[in-house]
Amino acid sequence: MQVRVLYWQEIPSLIRVTADDGAQLSRQLPDSFQQEIDRLAMEQGLIGSDAYLEQFVWHELEPRDGAPNDVLDAVEAELVAPRGA
């Protein structure tokens, strides 16, 4: 199963898993991640601009085995734990 994480600069925002059959599941990370993105974007003067959107980049993770929801749970736990969100 392919796993990708959407980042705004260095802050993860969304997890997407794609099964071998092409089925996709996505999960937004907790609100605290979006709040941090918004805070930094305001500090950098990027709110409401194309430059804000240009900061979003997909990162490919190592393929994972397991059920899609289990993979989403595992990746979310890995991303949330270091930030204590």
Sequence positions of predicted segments:
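Acidic, low-complexity intrinsically disordered segments
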Residues: 46-85
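Acidic, aromatic-enriched beta-alpha/helix-loop junctions
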Residues: 20-57
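Short, charged/polar N-terminal "headpieces" of proteins
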Residues: 1-24
